[in-house]
Amino acid sequence: MVEVSVSILNVKDDKAIQTLYNLETSGINYFHIDVMDGKFVKNDTTNKMLEFSEYLNQISNLPLDVHLMVEDVESYIKSFAIFDPNIITFHLEAGKSREEILKWIKLLNENNIRVGISIKPNTKVEEVYEYLPFVHLVLVMTVEPGEGGQKLLPDTIEKIKELKKYIDENNFEVDIEADGGINTENANIVREAGADMLVSGSAIINAEDYKEIIIKLKG
């Protein structure tokens, strides 16, 4: 069964405490922390996500799954490492060189944080292959990063299939996380393509019954 990481990007501030408490007991596996710097993507969620991460550390037993959509990856790793997340994922596209990307991987390893690397919809999946021996997870964006509530891009399903095939053929122990536009209508397609983790935000947050939606997402 796949795992579900709930994006709290669109949790309303005035309902945050109750919403996060209800999510905690709904059957999710992770809280997905969407960190945006206003540069790598147009929105800036840094302060909101720092606050949510600190709050979740105090009230939740669930692991944090931090997704950095930022240019200055190193400083953001340091900012969010203090919350002891299970995973921090950075974008391949943010790296200016192989050496820089390997430096970020080393920094995460030194902090005992699982390493995730993400690719945008227009990035070829082959570009991530050389890093598979060094990471725990590849996050495939199934929408353009930067905003919640978008529709899943169908072409990204093939990318997940290709990645899954390559991982299996080379016996890598790497999970695939799919993020963007995932709901109960398309989750089965994403699961069948080979995703191990589904990120879902709006589909869960806007539902009346979180538990029911999460059961359907997990299949």
Annotate each language-model stretch with its function.
Residues 46-66, 107-116, 156-176, 180, ...:
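Alpha-helix-loop-beta-strand connector modules within alpha/beta enzyme cores
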Residues 2-7, 31-33, 64-68, 88-90, ...:
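Hydrophobic faces of well-ordered beta-strands that scaffold small-molecule active sites
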Residues 31-50, 92-95, 143-149:
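Glycine-rich, proline-tolerant flexible connector loops at the mouths of alpha/beta enzymes
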Residues 88-96, 139-150, 193-214:
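Glycine-rich phosphate-binding active-site loops on the catalytic face of alpha/beta enzymes
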Residues 118-156:
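Histidine/lysine/aspartate-rich catalytic loop segments that bind and position anionic ligands
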Residues 45-102, 117:
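Glycine/small-residue-rich loop that forms an oxyanion/phosphate-binding "nest" at active or ligand-binding sites
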Residues 7-11, 36-38, 69-73, 93-95, ...:
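Active-site beta-loop-alpha junctions enriched in small/polar residues
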